[in-house]
Amino acid sequence: MSYAIETFDPEIFQAIENERERQTNHLEMIASENFTIPAVMEAMGSVFTNKYAEGYPHKRYYGGCEYADVVEQLAIDRACELFDCNYANVQPHSGSQANGAVYAALIKAGDKILGMDLSHGGHLTHGSKPSFSGKNYHSFTYGVELDGRINYDRVMEIAKIVQPKIIVCGASAYAREIDFKKFREIADEVGAILFADIAHIAGLVCAGEHPSPFPYADVVTTTTHKTLAGPRGGMIMTNDEDIAKKINSAIFPGLQGGPLVHVIAAKAVGFKHNLSDEWKVYAKQVKANASILADVLIKRGYDVVSGGTDNHLVLVSFLDKEFSGKDADAALGAAGITVNKNTVPGETRSPFVTSGIRIGSPALTSRGMKEIEFEIIANKIADVLDNVNDSELHAKIKEEMKELASNFVIYDKPIY
């Protein structure tokens, strides 16, 4: 049986080729995106895609799972080593699935949860009204102050008033370090479970470039892509055996059926990469590159929320500009620089328009770019923002960025 994609399905083949070309020639600067290594992609495309394996290692509902058990146990063991925890569930299909499982395992419908406001940098699954987390639970929010930072005393005040069952700490657009110890103190004060979502910063945490949520958080979730640069997926971790059992039941049979064994194999490969000395060097460079990006944009007169960054992302506000985040996103895209429009603290526009953009350093750092390239790119971003309607300038910068990108090819041959 041989069905080479190029001849069997030329439409899909062409779409893949076009996307590979786009990723190669454009500068990917969406903070939640990264480039994974070929070994991860090979595992994703392996024969494990054919295998059903409902249950957990050595406790399956299907036969023929002996090798599925091997890869899942490797993924679990490596995850626990990576984050210095006792239990890990590597089956969640996504970060949102992982977060949903935490709620399902530990609280009831209608219980109170306290998470970061979406427009202040939180995530949909932290209690936003359109999300299941805002519909199934009674959600409340905390935010950032005028300086763009979390005021932990204010979070304590809100928690005392709300008396939530779960406090969610973590964000999707917060550029500063999260103080998990202070969140632990707040949770203890009101008798709440502390749930840390480290999806955006996990790759920094495991390299020692951001404080760990352990031992402070009761339960921790993450995606396995983003700063971890693995396959798209989710994971849940804890040091509490009782919570681990509840989490396992919430994932299967609660929210999911058969796990994606090929993805779990890829997660294990990704974790091996994250455990290397090379990874620590990479994570340090991710932060250094983001810092340069923030510094240049500030020098060029742009409002960087919180005045800088401690991690992999930079949030830029256009509340004082006539153009919107949507306008900036489109202009930068035309210049060969891919970012995403993003809400900002004090947002006045709709979520489809926004007053800001979120920019990240992980993907370009994976391509080998360092401070010198990020200084060039940051200035080009500022040039575009200074001339958001100048299509001729955008086209010129696009060619310049394509030339820069050609020196940092991420995949030298197709991986399929």
From Swiss-Prot:
Enzyme Commission number, as recorded: 2.1.2.1
Source domain of life: Bacteria
A molecular function (GO) term: pyridoxal phosphate binding
CDD domains: SHMT (cd00378)
Site residues by UniProt (Plays an important role in substrate specificity): H225
UniProt catalytic activity: (6R)-5,10-methylene-5,6,7,8-tetrahydrofolate + glycine + H2O = (6S)-5,6,7,8-tetrahydrofolate + L-serine
Keywords associated with the record: Amino-acid biosynthesis, Cytoplasm, One-carbon metabolism, Pyridoxal phosphate, Transferase
Pathway: One-carbon metabolism; tetrahydrofolate interconversion; Amino-acid biosynthesis; glycine biosynthesis; glycine from L-serine: step 1/1
Name by which UniProt lists this protein: Serine hydroxymethyltransferase
Organism listed in the record: Sulfurovum sp. (strain NBC37-1)
Gene for this chain: glyA
